[in-house]
Structure formats: C-alpha cells, structure tokens
Amino acid sequence: MYLEKLSLTDFRSYAQVDLTLEPGVTVLVGYNGIGKTNLMEAIGYLATLSSHRVSSDAPLLRFGTERALIRAKLVRGGQSTVLELEINGSRANRGRINRSNPVRARDILGICQTVLFAPEDLALVKGDPSNRRRFLDELLVSLMPRHSATRTDYDRVLKQRNALLKSGRSGKFTAGHEATLDVWDQHMARAGAELLYARLELVERIRPHLKAAYAQLTDGSKEADAIYRSTLQGILDDDGAGAGYAAEPAAVERVEDLRALSVEELTQRYVQAFAASRRKELERGISLVGPHRDDVELILGEAPAKGYASHGETWSMCLSLRLASYYVMLDDARTGGSAPILILDDVFAELDVQRRRKLAAIVSGAEQVLVTAAVDADIPDELAGRRVKVVPGGIDESESR
C-alpha cells in the first residue's frame, strides 16, 4: 500500500495543503516548527483515529475553526481508495470511503495502515504503562478493526462501574447498588477477557520480531523481550505498577500463565478477582483490576529496560518495538492484508550514525517510506529518494526534487 495524495483542510497549522506522493522513499525537509510533523500526524490519525502527540482532538483543529478534514488517496495492488475523515469540535467525527455517505469514524479503520516512528516513542520505555497499552491497542485495531468496538465496550463498562464504586465511597452504597455492581462485574469481566485475550495473542506475535529487530539494530550482545503483566496475576500493585516482579524472578515463575486460558476462563478469573477486590475498590472508588491497569514489561538482557537501559539502548528498544509491529503487519500482508506505510518523523536527528544507518537499511525496502528532517544531512545515504520542501503554510514544488 502507498499514499498517492494527501489533502488537509483546517488541520493544525494548515488552512489548506495538498501533497502528491509516490512509492519508495520521500523525505520532507524543512526547519523545525514549519509543519512537517503536522502532515505525518494527519496520516497517522487517518490510520488509528488518534494522534501520537496529543490525547484529544481539539489541538488538531486550526485555531478558530470548528472542523478539520483529512482526505487521502491510497493505492493497493493497483486499486485506489479515497478516504475522508472529518474531525469535529462539537460532534462525532465522521468518515467517507470512496465518497460514500458518511460512516462512523471507526468504520474506516484498517484501510490505511501505518507504522509511525517519532521522538515521542521514548515513552514506550520510559513512560507509564498507559503508553505501552496504547501501543498494543493501536496495533491490535490496525490488524483487526473489530477490536475497536471491543475497546470501546470495555471503556464504557469501566466508566459505569467506576461511577457506581464512587457512590460507595461517598457513603451512598445500598443493597441495590450491590446487586447492580454484580451485574456490571459480569459485563466488565466479559469485555475485559476479550481485550486481554487479544492482547496476549498479539504480544506473542510481537516477541520474536522484537528480538530480531533489536539484534538487527545493535551488536546482538543483549536480547530484547516483552512480557505481558496482568492484574489477574497479582504482580502489579494497586496503582498498576510492578510489585517487584523484575527483581524477583522466582515470584514471576509462580504466577499463572494466562496465555493458556480461553476467553470464558479469563472471564471467570475476572469475576473472582472483582469479588476479592470489592472492599478495596469501594474504599478507593475505582476499578483496581482489569486490562486498563495492565502493563507490558520490556526486558533487555536480564533486566527491565525501564530504569536500566542506556539512552542508546532505550532508543534501540523503541525502534525495535515499531519495527516489530511493522513485521507483524507484513505477516498479515502475506495472507491478504496490506503492507503498512512507514513514517519516520524527525527520528534520525535523535540517533547516532550507526543506528541511523542500520535503521535506514532495514526500512529502505518498504513499499513507501515517509521521512521528515530539518536538514538533508540528517538522512543516511541508504534513504536516497525524492525530496519535498516544506515551507510556511504548504509545499514549495519549485524546491522539491
């Protein structure tokens, strides 16, 4: 798959901009703050319905406007698809496929597939568990769009259950509330089990690719790995942080391997866990058990990457996670899926020469690679390709080559 045309209206700094692209490598060059990342952000948003920079849609709308429009023409196997996504400030976002009648935004998921590398990726290692959960869920939805509904259902039930728990904290909890909480426990157990089962499967798909990617980017002296940590295993504390599992491998060996359980069995585990934690949850007014508090522990050698990896090792781990997601998507592409568009947003400026060259050599063979840089000198020779000059408010075609 490759992106042939991109058009933005009232998105971020752009009142209107049109960009024509082609397969292979395209490097967008322009000084910092000119709007290169805004272009890449729009493509990523079209693929995931979320920004890698902000948590809400409001900053995506050009100041003083009520809506933004992203329009893209994608080509796959000689067939073209036109996607439109309207981002609204006051109502639900809407999409269009080949100029159809409007559809829900989530109905366009899975059509445009991207893997986006950005400086913000450092949070995958250094940040809190929510960054790693988001990484998993975005990849999950890209591979299987139906899981967007799975996550939406879980978030809806979690919100309702938390509201009920808060009423208990305020002293308004009655026998009727207890019965209602039992019902919400069942709903949340089922929704949580479906999400957990999908995440566990995905992590197992990621792991071999993560190890291979890290070996490609480094000298191979350390091995990278990823292990899913669930609140069902009792090794996360009440704030979702690891309760010493990295320092106590013997304790980890004793925890239940959830990968062997079915959705039905995971549902029952959640029902039991909710019952066991009810008193504490009522005291705190929040749900303490569930996928919303899980983590993915990233391992480098024998130690957790977070807190132990050097700056260079942290970057290698982040890049390896993104490459692993790319390889997982390629696995699907071989059985009817689409090869994703690779986006490298201001990444090379953050890397030493060795990592630049190794990363460039790995990604250069992708069907389409979009790179942003402040100066040409940041781009390794392995990524020779078309250059596009980004200027205030748009593209300078006369300077592009």
Curated annotation (Swiss-Prot):
GO molecular function: ATP binding; ATP hydrolysis activity; single-stranded DNA binding
Signal peptide limits: none
Role this protein plays: The RecF protein is involved in DNA metabolism; it is required for DNA replication and normal SOS inducibility. RecF binds preferentially to single-stranded, linear DNA. It also seems to bind ATP.
Source organism of this protein record: Arthrobacter sp. (strain FB24)
Domain of life: Bacteria
GO BP annotations, alphabetical order: DNA replication; DNA synthesis involved in DNA repair; double-strand break repair; SOS response
Family stated for the protein in its record: Belongs to the RecF family.
Name of the protein this chain belongs to: DNA replication and repair protein RecF
Main location: cytoplasm
Chain positions recorded as ATP binding sites: 30-37
Matches recorded under Pfam families: SMC_N
PROSITE patterns: RECF_1, RECF_2
Keywords: ATP-binding, Cytoplasm, DNA damage, DNA repair, DNA replication, DNA-binding, Nucleotide-binding, SOS response
Compartments, as annotated in UniProt: Cytoplasm
InterPro entries, per database record: AAA+_ATPase, DNA-binding_RecF, DNA-binding_RecF_CS, P-loop_NTPase, RecF/RecN/SMC_N, RecF_2
Gene: recF
GO cellular component terms, semicolon-separated: cytoplasm
